Amino acid sequence: MHSRFFAGDLMNKKTRMLAHGAVIAALYVALTYFQNFLIPNSATWAIQFRVSEALCVLALFTPAAIPGLTIGCLLFNISFAGALPLDFLIGSLASLLATAGMYLTRRITIKGYPLLALLLPAVFNALLVGWELDVYIGGGFWLNALYVAIGEAAVLLTLGSLLYYAIKARHLDNTLFG
């Protein structure tokens, strides 16, 4: 009887992780499309303020955010007609590395604030997407990397921080992901 309970509990945990990842991916795609609908190309230019990137904060609370955000980015970039040819691969790789890094560094804080983790998406996206932009549209790697980093850091340090503190203040980290 005990082994059945454990196996069922393990299955519930796997199912919960899969469901969380799927919901996060769907939210990412929906938010990005909605933003692009309201303000065309605001989520796809070199200096982009992709509101959905604030969801990267979820990687501080659950490992399900790693595949969820990676797949969400992949789905949007594949489905967006204006995406660069390799953006589905490069952008998704940047999301994977950033969210995995965020999850691994989530306990490194400054007075309870996970600054390092919140900056990782800016770093990975700047390096990878900055390179991709330089390859396809030119303008220089460092300038493109700077543009990407500015947009990414702005979203994570504002909207991402607000989301982080809202989740913590309402103890939703335990309720939603516990």
Name the predicted role of every residue range.
Residues 36-45, 54, 74-100, 104-178:
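Membrane-embedded alpha-helical hairpins and interfacial helices in multi-pass inner-membrane proteins
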